[in-house]
Amino acid sequence: MPIDNAAAWNRISGGEPGGVLPGIDSVQYGPDIAGESEFRLLGSVERKRVLELGCGGGQNLVALAKQGAHAIGLDFAPAQLAAVKRLAEKEGVRVELHQGPLSELPFMRADSVDLVLSAYALGFVEDLNRVFRQVHRVLKEGAPFVFSMPHPAYDLLDDDADDPLLIRRSYFDRSPVEYAWDGQELSDHHRTVAEVFAGLCRAKFRVDTILEPEPRVDGPRSRHWREPFRMVPRTLLVRGRKEGS
């Protein structure tokens, strides 16, 4: 039976912000890597309409709102959205929230968004190409789509094994990657870097940035840290800009 990621995240949230992203003052892209303050992929978001796909616990959405954005969040897990609402109220910012699949954006008009962001959520989506088409539809001409996702090379490893660098599966195996998170079973859809790039191009995005961030070399480690982070990229970070209509 396929894993129900939405139900799992409803249980994981436990009424509090969840996920892999720390902090609420700056946009973060993944565990134990630098964030927007270093990568500078978004530009100024002040007075911009910004849509986050898979807003999770709301840390990035609140950070965007604090910087003056009209922050719009979409998530498939109602319990996560409830946690986002509480976090936004606590921080004294306003956010707009929607519940539904990340591949469906009926609440957004065409050419109405200045920026779309997604951090570690697109792996849960089965039809990634539909997400790309929907994002292209709602973005303004030339506007950026910035997203991070689990790096497909890291999917090959079992980082809880005695030998975490032992390859456990083929890079070309498209079956979902199943794993445990806070006691719940989750799954990510595995795609190669080439497939992600080709999907963006078919959806009429011009890709100008692909990053495989190295982990932070100093400072505290998150609870998600694994030693293989030092040798195999954990996160794939991409920016594309809308071209055409």
Please report, for each region that a protein language model flagged, where it lies by residue.
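A short SAM/SAH-binding and catalytic strip from SAM-dependent methyltransferases
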Residues: 114-129
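A short acidic, Gly/Pro-enriched loop at the edge of an enzyme's catalytic core
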Residues: 107-115
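Acceptor-substrate binding/catalytic loop of class I
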Residues: 149, 153, 180-195
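A short glycine-rich, Lys/Arg-flanked "PGG" loop and its adjoining helix->strand segment in the class I
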Residues: 129-144
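Conserved class I S-adenosyl-L-methionine
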Residues: 1-46, 59-63, 87, 144-176
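Class I SAM-dependent methyltransferase SAM/SAH-binding core
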Residues: 49-53, 57-104
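Short alpha-helix
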Residues: 186-210
